[in-house]
Amino acid sequence: MARGPKKHLKRVAAPKHWMLDKLTGVFAPRPSTGPHKLRECLPLIIFLRNRLKYALTGDEVKKICMQRFIKIDGKVRTDITYPAGFMDVISIEKTGEHFRLVYDTKGRFAVHRITAEEAKYKLCKVRKIFVATKGIPHLVTHDARTIRYPDPLIKVNDTVQINLETGKITDFIKFDTGNLCMVTGGANLGRIGVITNREKHPGSFDVVHVKDANGNSFATRLSNIFVIGKGNKPWISLPRGKGIRLTIAEERDKRLAAKQSSG
């Protein structure tokens, strides 16, 4: 009987969106416990080594982190397996680069560069609202932040904009039809569209219908919806493709057109 925490992760069992090949080794970096779930995060080592190619080995990543160059959400992180996740801002002071972790339409974390201005805030989905001791209202976000005394108009499933320096809420977007959202789970992971309607199913999962910029409609669970803008104006810059998933035929046509124009 195994007691205590698991400390290893086999490469074959690692999440597919990390895009690790099966044959390079036996193990994958097991993310530390932190604000994002193991299967929904991207360990810092994979971001620096496999995505940005700033290091060749895990030891090199360790050396970069231990020099305190890497900040996540404005805090220095020296743990190479720190679980960065959706909407986190990764800043590298030395190179003056800032990244926001958002999904591309294939459901992977895109390397999405942002300006220093945009790196000052992040969006968080409200998971839970409760009243604690002495009647103080608390709000819990998707990245495990607990914020006291939130605006009483903020409800569960809304999105709050958080200033990373102070950790305070600066603004919020209601979960409402007509607002722009990104899908953060399920088969439509990474797609962006406008909420058209919400079906309530008491005792089961509420279903939300979304329509993307090309007019394609799809439905997903309420728990997978993350509001990112009022109307159709996003509050963050979007990765390439703007969250519109092409069909296989459309992708092929796009590739051929690009090939002809270059050839």
From Swiss-Prot:
Transmembrane segments: none
Name of this protein: Small ribosomal subunit protein eS4, Y isoform 1
GO terms, biological process: translation
Any one cellular-component term (Gene Ontology): cytosolic small ribosomal subunit
UniProt cross-references to CDD domains, sorted A to Z: KOW_RPS4, S4
Top-rank lineage group of the source organism: Eukaryota
One Pfam family recorded for the sequence: Ribosomal_S4e
GO function term, MF aspect, one: rRNA binding
Gene responsible for this protein: RPS4Y1
Family stated for the protein in its record: Belongs to the eukaryotic ribosomal protein eS4 family.
Native source species: Monodelphis domestica
InterPro entries tied to this protein: KOW, Rib_uL2_dom2, Ribosomal_eS4, Ribosomal_eS4_C, Ribosomal_eS4_central_region, Ribosomal_eS4_central_sf, Ribosomal_eS4_KOW, Ribosomal_eS4_N
PROSITE patterns reported in the protein's UniProt record: RIBOSOMAL_S4E, S4
Disulfides per UniProt: none
Domain S4 RNA-binding: 42-104
Keyword set, alphabetical order: Ribonucleoprotein, Ribosomal protein, RNA-binding, rRNA-binding
